[in-house]
Design a protein with these regions (language model features):
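A short, flexible beta-alpha/helix-coil linker loop
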Residues: 43-48, 84-86
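C-terminal/domain-edge helix-coil "capping" segments
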Residues: 20-36, 43-45, 64-66, 72-76, ...
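Glycine- and acidic-residue-enriched helix-capping/strand-helix junction motifs
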Residues: 48-61
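Bacterial N-terminal signal peptides that target proteins for export
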Residues: 1-7
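N-terminal signal peptide c-region/cleavage motif recognized by signal peptidases
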Residues: 14-16
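Short, solvent-exposed, polar/charged sequence segments at loop or secondary-structure edges
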Residues: 72-117
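Active-site-proximal beta-strand/loop segments in catalytic clefts of secreted hydrolases
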Residues: 39-41, 81-82, 119-120
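Short, well-ordered secondary-structure micro-motifs
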Residues: 48-49, 90-91, 128
Length: 179
């Protein structure tokens, strides 16, 4: 059978080659996910009578949960925690703890648009407080500030509070990241 003077076999090969070419053409790259840096949570013992042996472990567990929750997100890219910790250590070289301005500077240094930081305070034997913030590193301004009162087993509840904060960070970045 002929189609306008061409053999059918030629027409099929030509159509298949065009389909292959358009199928192998690269699709547009997805927009990059916004980068977020996390400055490790710190223990604020200002209100505690005595630093207990497990206090730093509670803060470490909360930091770990915050990092894990953000790392699992498909809406943002978490900057490597070792890279952030190294930048914080350099910034703290003068002996001052990394404050808000330091956290923003660290985010800029590691190429992150966003930076999260916070403290955990032991208010009493039964009550702890996680205070955490998210900053836009382009403006240096906070875009999210949360406090979570932790009652009961702090070793279990502090990571749970950090998980909730991480979810709020993800949502805030998704809402503000496109602006």
């Amino acid at each position: 059978m002929r189609f306008k003077g061409l053999p059918l076999a030629f027409l099929l090969i030509s159509t298949a080659a065009r389909a292959q070419t358009s199928a192998s053409a690269p699709s547009p790259a997805p927009s990059p996910r916004p980068a977020v840096a996390v400055v490790n949570l710190r223990f604020d013992g200002e209100h505690a009578n005595v630093l207990q042996a497990g206090d730093t472990a509670i803060v470490a567990a909360a930091t770990s949960k915050l990092l894990a929750t953000l790392a699992a997100s498909d809406r943002l890219a978490l900057v490597d925690s070792t890279t952030v910790a190294t930048a914080v250590a350099v910034a703290e070289g003068s002996g001052n703890p990394c404050d808000n301005a330091c956290a923003v500077a660290v985010a800029r240094k590691v190429g992150a648009r966003w930076v999260a930081k916070g403290t955990i305070s032991n208010l009493s034997n039964l009550v702890w407080l996680l205070t955490a913030e998210l900053f836009d590193a382009t403006t240096g301004k906070p875009v999210l500030a949360d406090s979570y009162e932790i009652k009961g087993d702090a070793a279990r509840m502090a990571p749970a509070a950090a998980h909730v904060f991480a979810q709020r960070v993800e949502k805030t970045i998704a809402e503000k990241g496109s602006r």
